[in-house]
Amino acid sequence: MQLSWKDIPTVAPANDLLDIVLNRTQRKTPTVIRPGFKITRIRAFYMRKVKYTGEGFVEKFEDILKGFPNINDVHPFHRDLMDTLYEKNHYKISLAAISRAKSLVEQVARDYVRLLKFGQSLFQCKQLKRAALGRMATIVKKLRDPLAYLEQVRQHIGRLPSIDPNTRTLLICGYPNVGKSSFLRCITKSDVDVQPYAFTTKSLYVGHFDYKYLRFQAIDTPGILDRPTEEMNNIEMQSIYAIAHLRSCVLYFMDLSEQCGFTIEAQVKLFHSIKPLFANKSVMVVINKTDIIRPEDLDEERAQLLESVKEVPGVEIMTSSCQLEENVMEVRNKACEKLLASRIENKLKSQSRINNVLNKIHVAQPQARDDVKRTPFIPESVKNLKKYDPEDPNRRKLARDIEAENGGAGVFNVNLKDKYLLEDDEWKNDIMPEILDGKNVYDFLDPEIAAKLQALEEEEEKLENEGFYNSDDEEEIYDGFEASEVDDIKEKAAWIRNRQKTMIAEARNRKSLKNKAIMPRSKLTKSFGKMEEHMSTLGHDMSALQDKQNRAARKNRYVERGSDVVFGDQDALTASTENGVKLRQTDRLLDGVADGSMRSKADRMAKMERRERNRHAKQGESDRHNAVSLSKHLFSGKRGVGKTDFR
């Protein structure tokens, strides 16, 4: 059950609510649309605007409706308190207006979205959007008064104290200025304003304290005047509703000195007037300000008026003085005891709860099947068992005794293998590895392992004697193959393995190239020797081809003549060109440069030329691109004050 409403969201005024929702629509939805776009795109653009705006208003209204409490679902005390403070009908009408506006906005959004689906042009869709947003704005503007009222209620309801109607409560009531707030300050840490004039307390104040490890709350109520309920104001009605609805111990305070401004007769009359509200409650009358006058000092007439209060059944009278802090804690403790006793009594009176518990309890008892008495059986060995006597020299030694004989704790080391059950007691302390040669020893343990090993060795010896492992034909190495065939197979297998290795190496070389250039097969140099070796491996006879190559070489052989000596350079150049040998290429960067100093000067000049291009971010001498002079992200936009982004 909710006891406080401090987390209700702020209720914005009507104009502010309009600005919030419309600005969010402008920021969260697209803003560029042109007549040249497809009509489906234009319709979707404006339908999105209408839907988003309607959802924004509906969301704000739902937050308001969910934040405020439903006055029909709260405790009767809170319901009557809210009725007194905020006028229940006014509160309901305001929330109903918000709920009605929510449904109207939803209806407007649906109707205009349906119309926008048949819009024929941008202008028509835009006018429909304006009409939809205008109708929503009109609906919201009509909520100016309900929204302002709900904001005031939110601010006030958030400051109300958290009062639990069902917990242990001490309720302090009485005429104004009789010492109620002073008593609350004495028994709790509540900082209540105390003044020497009436009606200082205008609302309910709550303080908490502990008694017997239980949490109690004490409520200070505003002063009550003796007049009909219809004539009471909101301040007095808060006290009346607290007395009527809260399960508490009522402390009715009286001032016999009459410094509060009311006579003893009026105070007694008020007690009898509100006596019907004390039904099923513990009541105590507290005579306060005994430092000024005590009950014994009253005259006979006033004493009789005070005695009339005792005639009410269950009412006790106690005295206290908040000024001197006399009997304050005794009054508090007595009230707490009465409250606890009454709560326990009320629980016992509610038979339904007791019956619910009794219905869940069932005590089952076994039924006798015959008249035979079955006494417990105790073996004779147990009966004859002697009680352990530490002084008996023939007693059975315990592990504790053995430890004491061998030096005590910290000196004696317990042998954990002493209780092993083995064939030979000498095996108990043998070292047995758990892991041997990387294997778990326990996986190979077998009680008959020696016998199995001997049987296996005998079987192997028998097979060797029978010649099971000997070959029938020493010349026949493999079934169905002669020795020559086996050699041929091995040779071919070796060639296949070498070929596979070569293919793998070539594939790896191709992968390792990645983005590097690969030399085409047609450009690779091929020698006759490599071709001859390759063809020989394939089983071809290359002798005839070798003779033909030798004859062609002798025919084209060059013989030096006398003229070659004179024109040697030119002929050598011609011969080398004819044979297909490439000329050595020269570095053209060095052409036209006389020496190293000229070369360094040329480098410096080239560097200076590149500096200007780099400053303008040019790609080279041929780059003629002109960049924009104004940055779009800095200079584009509809307004110049920096409030709106470019559209």
Curated annotation (Swiss-Prot):
Segments for region (Disordered): 594-647
Modified residues (Phosphoserine): 563
SUPFAM superfamilies assigned to the protein according to its UniProt record, in alphabetical order: P-loop containing nucleoside triphosphate hydrolases (SSF52540)
An example Gene Ontology CC term for this record: cytoplasm
Residue ranges occupied by any OBG-type G domain in the UniProt entry: 168-340
KW Nucleus (keyword) present: yes
Chief localisation class: nucleus
Tagged with keyword Iron-sulfur: no
A matching Pfam family: NOG1_N
GO MF, any single term: GTPase activity
InterPro entries registered for this protein in UniProt: G_OBG, GTP-bd, NOG1, NOG1_N, NOG1_Rossman_fold_dom, NOG_C, P-loop_NTPase
Protein keywords: GTP-binding, Nucleotide-binding, Nucleus, Phosphoprotein, Ribosome biogenesis
Annotated compartments: Nucleus, Nucleolus
Function: Involved in the biogenesis of the 60S ribosomal subunit.
Protein name: Nucleolar GTP-binding protein 1
Taxonomic lineage: Eukaryota, Fungi, Dikarya, Ascomycota, Saccharomycotina
Gene name linked to the record: NOG1
